[in-house]
């Protein structure tokens, strides 16, 4: 039997097992954002990610290294753009993004408006985003696409889902019933900017996935 670790009401599997299953919600229990923050504070060295969606606690294991590479490259590109067009600030998780009372997420990469960054840069809880980016992992794909998406669509003007296996980005906006599928290039034109953020989607995946010489 696989070893299991209990944290309050949540059973955690070792990373090598958890990577093969979906994100695990706590059962028979509704959580609050305050309780989830306390759980994070009580486990500062834990590798799982804790998120709250519609009162359910989601626990995600540590991601693969290629996931981290995708996050790092996206952050670098967004920050480069925002240095030229200072209309926001880009960061990565772990960060507490509380968009609703029962929606506390840790998007892989996110952009907050400049006014929000000025408000929270010495605090902890982010409440407004311009863009949320999730990079799919085997353990989180279903929840990034289905469970968390409505919360992002209600509160964020752009939600990007990066699919490393398919080499595409799904772009969701608040009124969308289906995503825009982007495989070659994409643009994001935030309010107040003089020029859009332009992403060579194919080039991005080449940089993330293809080792030198391939």
Where are these regions (language model features)?
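Gly/Pro/Ser/Thr-rich low-complexity, intrinsically disordered segments predominantly at protein N-termini
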Residues: 2-214
